[in-house]
Amino acid sequence: MQGMASVVSCEPWALLGRGALCTKARPGGGPAAGTVVAPGSPDRGRPRSRNSLASQDQQGAVTSGTAHKALFSRDTNFLQEINRKQEAAPTGTRHKAKSQGLVTFGDVAVVFSQEEWEWLNSEQRSLYWKVMLDNYRNLASLGLCASQPDMITSLEQGRDPWMMKRKMRKGQHLDLKAMQETKEFPPKDLSEETLFLAVLRKQLLPHRPKCSMVRAAWEGGAVFTTHRGLKTNSGLARDSPAQLVSAQRSFCKSVTWENCGDRGSVGQQSVQEAQDLLPRQDSHAERVTGRTWSTKLECSTFRDQDSECTFERNEQETVTPNRAFSEGRDGMCIESGRWFHLNSSDERSHNCDSGKSFSSNPVVVKETGICSGKKLFQCNECKKTFTQSSSLTVHQRIHTGEKPYKCNQCGKAFSDGSSFARHQRCHTGKKPYECPECGKAFIQNTSLVRHWRYYHTGEKPFDCIDCGKAFSDHIGLNQHRRIHTGEKPYTCEVCHKSFRYGSSLTVHQRIHTGEKPYECEICRKAFSHHASLTQHQRVHSGEKPFKCKECGKAFRQNIHLASHWRIHTGEKPFECGECGKSFSISSQLATHQRIHTGEKPYECKVCRKAFTQKAHLAQHQKTHTGEKPYECKECGKAFSQTTHLIQHQRVHTGEKPYKCLECGKAFGDNSSCTQHRRLHTGQRPYECVECGKTFKTKSSLICHRRCHTGEKPYECSACGKAFSHRQSLSVHQRIHSGKKPYECKECRKTFIQIGHLNQHKRVHTGERTYNYKKGRRAFRQTAHFAHHQQIHSGKSPAHHSLPSTSNPVDLFSKFVWNPSSLPSS
C-alpha cells in the first residue's frame, strides 16, 4: 500500500516537554507508515479524540521535531478506498468501521487552556499552528470537512487557541489514571491547575446534567450546588488520594449539580478535588498562584417549586504580578435565566432581559443582590441598606448635604446625576416619554408609568397595610403612609413648620420668598405652584376634565370632583375634635377650627384687619380698591362679590328660595332667612363683652361695639363728618345730593330715609303706636314719646332751642301735626 496521509494529533505535554508530536493510530493498528518512532517509547503515545479518550488498543508513534515534515505526505487513494468499503458494507459493519477510526478534524484537534499556552515557547506555538492547519488541509482535501471549523478561522486570524476553549466544550483532557498505569507523566513544570481540571472533567463527564443550560456551563468548567429542600441521590465513585502520586496533596469539596428542569429526583455527584496534584517548583512560586473565586447566584426561576437554585463558579485563576483575572468566567442572570460570559475588563459582555449589564466579578455580586433581594451595602448613619454601592454613595449625600451636580442655567444643585438630567429637561422642554393612548408627554419615565396607571388602566398595585387604600405607584403609598405614622420629615427653616412632602415644603417656602415662578402666558398672572398654573389655564381654555359619573357635572380639578362626589355619598370624613362637627372637605375643617383657635392668618396690608379665610381677605381688599367687577345686566349696579350679585338679581326675578318653616315667609338670601328665624326662637347669639347686650346678627354687634370704642370709620367726603355706620353715611350724603328716594303715595311727599316715610304715613292713618300709661296719651314717634316722659319725671327737656339742621331727624319733632293744639269750637 502506498504511503498514507498522516494526520497528526498531539498531547499538550508532547509540545511542552519534549518537542515531539504523536500521531493518530491508523485503523489497522501499529505505527503508521512513513513515521519515525521515538526510541524507547513504541506504544506509549495516548492520543485522545474530541469525544472520548483513545482506547487502549490504539497505538501511536512519537516523531521527532525535525522529522515531522514526513508526516504530511498524502495518499488520497487509501482513505477513499476506506470510504468505498464502508459505504458498501452492511449497516452494522459500517457503524463498526466508523467506530474504528474514520478521522475527523474533531478527533485530531487539540485545545490548550490559557495556562498551558503560556508555557509554550515561540517555536512550540509555531509548530502547533502549522500542525493544526496542515491537519485541516489534509482532511479538507479528502472531503472530510464540510465547513471550516471556528478553531481554524481563529488560527488563521492569529488568535490564541485558548480563546476557543469555551466554544469547544468537549476538548481534550488528560487521563491521569492511564498515565499512572503506563508510568508516563507529563513534565513537572506543567500547570497543576490544568491537570486538576482535566482530571475533574474526565471523572464527571459520564454524569453530565440533563439540563441544557446547566450542562453547557458545566462542560465549560462550572460547578453547581444543589437546590435546597429537594430530594437528592448520591452515587459517584470517589477518587482516593492513594491513586495520586505521593507528592500530591488533596482537599475535598462537594461539587454538585442537578437537573433544573425536573422537580423529581435530583442527581448529586461528589468528587475529591486535588488541590496540589504536583509539587510546586520554587522557581515558579511567585509566578503561579492558585486561587478559587466563587460567584453565587440565586435562581428565582424555581421559587414556585419551593426550592432555590444557586450557581457557583469555581475557577482556578493564574495571577501574575502584572495580570489578574485575565480569563473570563461564565455565569447566569437570575432574572432572565440566561447564561452570560464575564470578562475582567471594563467592557460589558452581557445584556440580560432585565436590562442589566454585567462586567467584572464585583458587579456580579451586586447583580446577585438585586435578583435575590439581598441588600449588601449599609449606611453607617441610618443603617439603611442598598443593593448597589453607587446607591449608597448617593444616599450618603443626604447626610453630608453634598450636591455635586449644578445646573448652569438656574444654579440649582443636585445630589445625583439622574435628578440633574431630569431637571435639565425643564430648561430644554424635552419630554421624551409619550403616552401611546392620549399622546401626553413626560420628562420622566416614572411619570409616564404613573399617568398610564392613573388615567388609562386604573391599576393600583400598591396597597396600604393600615387602611387598605390602593395607589398606582409606590411613591404615593410612601407619602400616604406618613398620614398613619404622623411623620413630617420636611421642616421650614424660617417658621419651623413641618410637612409630609418635600414638594409641600418647596411651595411653602415661596410664601416667605414671594417667588412665583409659574406665569400664565395669556393674562400674565403668576403662581407659586405649577399645579395652580395648570388649574388656572383651564379657566381660559374652559377645560373641565374631571366628570362626575353620577350626575355628569364636570370640574377643573380632581379635588373638586372628590368633594362633589361626597354630596352623592353623604360622606363627611373630616370631623372637628372640639365640637364634633363634620365636613366633607378637609379645607372646610381647617377653616372651621380657626373659630376655636381664634387664628386669623390672612391680614389686610392696608388696614391690618385679619381674616380666617383667604377668600374673605380678597373680598375685603376690594373695599379699599373700590373694585366692583360683578355688574347687574338689568340695572347696571355693580358689586364686589359674586354672591352679592346673585342675591341682587333675585330682586329683579322675584325669586325667594329660602323659606321660614315657622311663618312661611320667604327670603332672597340664606343669611336673611337665618336672621329671621331668630325672631321665632328669640336667639341672640352675639353678645357684647362690654355691656352684655345681645344681638341677633353679627353685623349689629360690630356696629354696637363702636359705641364703646367711639370709632367712626365712615367719613363724608363733602363735609368731613364721620359716622360709625355705613348706612348713616349713605343717608347723610343724600343731604348734599338732595336725593329723596322714598315717596308717599298719598300726598307725593318725598323723604330721605324710609323711616321718615313710615312716620309720615301715620299722619294719614292716624295711627299712634306709642302709648303713655299714666296720661293715656299716644305718640307716633319714639322721640316724641321719650320727650313726653321727661315732663312727668320732672326732668327738663334736653333741648329747648331749635334743633340743628345737621341731623334732619331732629327737625320732625317741631313740625309734627298735633290735633290737641287746634282751638276748640
Swiss-Prot record:
Major localisation: nucleus
Tissues where the protein occurs: Expressed predominantly in ovary.
Bias type Polar residues, positions: 51-65
Domain KRAB: 103-174
GO terms for MF: DNA binding; zinc ion binding
Pfam family, one: zf-C2H2
Alphabetic keyword roster: DNA-binding, Metal-binding, Nucleus, Repeat, Transcription, Transcription regulation, Zinc, Zinc-finger
GO cellular component: nucleus
Biased composition (Low complexity): 33-42
Zinc finger feature spans (C2H2-type): 377-399, 405-427, 433-456, 462-484, 490-512, 518-540, 546-568, 574-596, 602-624, 630-652, 658-680, 686-708, 714-736, 742-764, 770-792
GO terms classed as biological process: regulation of DNA-templated transcription
CDD domains associated with the record: KRAB_A-box (cd07765)
Chain segments carrying region Disordered: 26-65
Keyword Secreted: no
Localization of this protein: Nucleus
Annotated function: May be involved in transcriptional regulation. May have a role in embryonic development.
Membership in a protein family: Belongs to the krueppel C2H2-type zinc-finger protein family.
The name this protein goes by in its record: Zinc finger protein 28
Organism per entry: Mus musculus (Mouse)
